[in-house]
């Protein structure tokens, strides 16, 4: 059963400017393993986190570090803990599906949550 679908797009150049202008933003949005990635990859991961938030109804008090994007042999994966895990479990999410891409200055992500 599909619990929800979320889609988000991020302007890579604008996102990069925000990271430069706000030094603590990278630390607030990303776990240590993500922080070392280039701006294009970070923009795609932020789009994925936004898509996860949309699936979950943009829960109040969501900690951005409670959702991170990993990689396995099949591609990108959604990983959750804490505040995000609690809402996902309450909504019956058992499995996440994620597709990310970037082209022409835009990063995009689509997330499907399955119950």
Curated annotation (Swiss-Prot):
Which NCBIfam families has this protein been placed in?
A: pantethn_trn, PRK00070.3-2
Q: What does this protein do?
A: Transfers the 4'-phosphopantetheine moiety from coenzyme A to a Ser of acyl-carrier-protein.
As for subcellular location, the record says: Cytoplasm
Required cofactor(s): Mg(2+)
Which keywords does UniProt give here?
A: Cytoplasm, Fatty acid biosynthesis, Fatty acid metabolism, Lipid biosynthesis, Lipid metabolism, Magnesium, Metal-binding, Transferase
Which cellular component, as a GO term, is one annotated location? Answer: cytoplasm
Against SUPFAM superfamilies, the record matches this protein to: 4'-phosphopantetheinyl transferase
- Return the protein name: Holo-[acyl-carrier-protein] synthase
Which family would the database say this protein is a member of? Belongs to the P-Pant transferase superfamily. AcpS family.
Question: What are the binding positions for Mg(2+) in this chain?
Answer: 8, 50
Please list the reactions this protein catalyses. Answer: apo-[ACP] + CoA = holo-[ACP] + adenosine 3',5'-bisphosphate + H(+)
Q: Can you provide one Gene Ontology molecular function annotated for this UniProt record?
A: holo-[acyl-carrier-protein] synthase activity
What is the originating organism of this protein?
Paenarthrobacter aurescens (strain TC1)
GO BP terms, alphabetized: fatty acid biosynthetic process
As recorded in UniProt, its EC number(s) are: 2.7.8.7
């Amino acid at each position: 059963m599909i619990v929800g679908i979320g889609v988000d797009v991020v302007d890579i150049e604008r996102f990069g400017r925000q990271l430069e202008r706000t030094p603590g933003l990278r630390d607030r949005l990303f776990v240590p393993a993500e922080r070392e990635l280039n701006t294009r990859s970070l923009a795609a991961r932020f789009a994925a986190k936004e898509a996860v938030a949309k699936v979950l109804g943009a829960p109040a008090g969501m900690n951005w570090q409670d959702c991170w994007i990993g990689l396995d042999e099949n591609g990108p994966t959604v990983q959750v803990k804490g505040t995000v895990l609690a809402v996902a479990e309450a909504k019956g999410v058992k499995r996440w599906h994620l597709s990310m891409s970037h082209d022409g200055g835009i990063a995009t992500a689509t997330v499907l949550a399955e119950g």
